[in-house]
């Protein structure tokens, strides 16, 4: 069984890379100019959907209410699987970008995006972190949604989450845009964070997209911590309810 899990993990990752390199000319074209970002989002969605299909994954999204993705927002989610990022590309639309660790600049696939559209952050450098924060704030103010994982890294103890960092919530408050919480319910069961060693299994990925939270009420002193705690509890409650089903 362990061998089959590892074989499936290798197969899925190969499909991700294969589809990416076939589509590379389109990705290269779409990442050259800012006004092509919506087109890039559609390309990412197609890429991820096809890779999922070839990797024997299905997906089911449940939305608490209809979401207008034409308006900028900060989208935050729990992070415990390599499936999280491609899955969120399937479930959203519009003009968006990611913020992620600087190591992704060396990733054979993702470096194209982090050298152009997405924003890398070096958490070991206060100056680099500040510059990255200002960059994404400017992008959001110009109408581009931001996607990031407030845990800061992948949780290896899912369904337990790591403590949230405040960056995502500060950006949302400072830019006067809503926070959109997203809960990945079972990705860690299909492909855990240590998937390189534990492997993966096919299945249906389940996602709950919560209603947006207006950040206008969190500008007062203590509002940042209050917002972070509230979003953590919203995502965690849904995650734990599913885990204890």
PLM region descriptions:
Residues 2-60, 112-113:
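A transmembrane-helix-recognition feature enriched in membrane-embedded lipid enzymes
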Residues 3, 131-245:
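Non-catalytic C-terminal accessory region of glycerolipid acyltransferases
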Residues 23-34, 38-41, 54, 69-126:
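Catalytic core of membrane glycerolipid acyltransferases/transacylases, capturing the structured
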Residues 47, 84-87, 100, 109, ...:
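Hydrophobic alpha-helical segments typical of transmembrane helices
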Residues 54-62, 129-130, 189-192:
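Short gly/ser/thr-rich secondary-structure transition/capping motifs
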Residues 61, 75, 98, 207-209:
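Generic preference for hydrophobic
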Residues 63-68:
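Glycine-rich helix-loop-beta junction characteristic of Rossmann-like nucleotide cofactor-binding loops
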